């Protein structure tokens, strides 16, 4: 039996000595009928797994017993042998029940159901903790097949590179350098006859025009990807880009507005490789800055980009003028460009002294890797699995990122699906190299639940802002507002935490993550400094914005059976919960 639906249980009873359950696809109590209890599996926490990108890890193996997984964890060399044997003879399922596709990846934007029904902790050969996971039937569900997108229909792997460049007062030499480097790259690409496979775009960003109207724009698409396919057109349009003649109100600029303009404002369809290169000499305005246009923090901006399979690089110009901001900006941009593969770490690179030519070299280095990847794919050159050293170069990291993007593209092109299986054990790490994560853990939320979570966070944020001058009234304010949302205000008044009051939804209870929000109590709130309280609220506010991007991510919402629109499901990364 394969899981075809996610069902809610409304009643259980014994019929002729056998347990049966009354189930329905919707949350409104409507029943679709009865099923033998033996044909369903209890799935209490709605936890699901998503395969991580294939930027160096081996395909995931699904085994019969947890003990077999544990044995391979302790011996990666043996795991490599078992994997090689399984790849050679896929019919032999004595030990390996199923295998993730080898020649391509299961696409990041394809919906498949990989629920966790049980888990236990184990350790790898170095004593590092690893989760052993019992997963049941994997199935893309009953959703109708989606029409092929341009990216799937196209035979060729194409790459889009969008430069998001700070265009404030000091930046003209860097704007000119980026323009010239892109022109040189396009000249080389043209010589290979591959201009249709690599396109460049340009976004400029500045700072608040409310505070400084003379800046003209906060973020703006200066050259679209369609325009940027033509080298002469890119060159002519880039020559028109001028740095502002007006100074911003702060040294930090609105880099996140620039990145989000690229994420949401560019047409990325038709491109398997999707890259943003952020170029700036300043830190970014964060959520807690009243003049920040996005009202998002770096982790949320990164997640919004990943939702569209876009990778962000940060090229940080460490000029003398920005010395005081260097450390803070580096921290921001390392979070913004963080990669799930710990061998990659992040895609941050500093340009010492703000050297114009060094910036050009870095842009050329990254652009060349992706241009070469396109060339290799077009000439059918086999792609070796990336093997990253302990201190990989920018080019090595880029090659691994490009490899993962090409694997994802191949998965979409060949309609690769997650393997079908009834029940199996695996690990949350690559069995052949446990340093690499194999999965991202998500929680399945309905559209109604996500909306409820967002409204609850808004209630908490509003309550905190109303009581800034009298923090002891914070929980009283939440308790009063909770009554309007049919929650339990008495639980909050009795010294309970936000979970006790039911404010953040029972669907968050019991999840395997540490939640600052769920565990917040009146005493803990009062023990925080003003700055810590502000950080807490800013993070919640930033998540509210992120949930809006999830809500608008139409392609990745799925409905089963006759479920209502409000019961559509989305895989929300556990790391993005409050």
Residue ranges and their predicted role:
Residues 17-19, 31-33, 43-45, 171-174, ...:
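Extracytoplasmic/secreted cell-surface and envelope-processing proteins
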Residues 7, 15, 28-29, 41-42, ...:
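Solvent-exposed loop/turn segments at secondary-structure junctions
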Residues 106-162, 168-176, 188-191:
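Acidic, polar low-complexity linker/tail segments
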Residues 159, 195-201, 243, 268-276, ...:
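Loop/turn elements at helix/coil->beta-strand transitions in domains of secreted/extracellular proteins
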Residues 4-38, 84-122:
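SH3/SH3-like beta-barrel superfamily modules
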Residues 155-277, 284, 315, 318, 322-323:
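Von Willebrand factor
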Residues 303-306, 310, 317-578:
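P/S/T/G-enriched low-complexity
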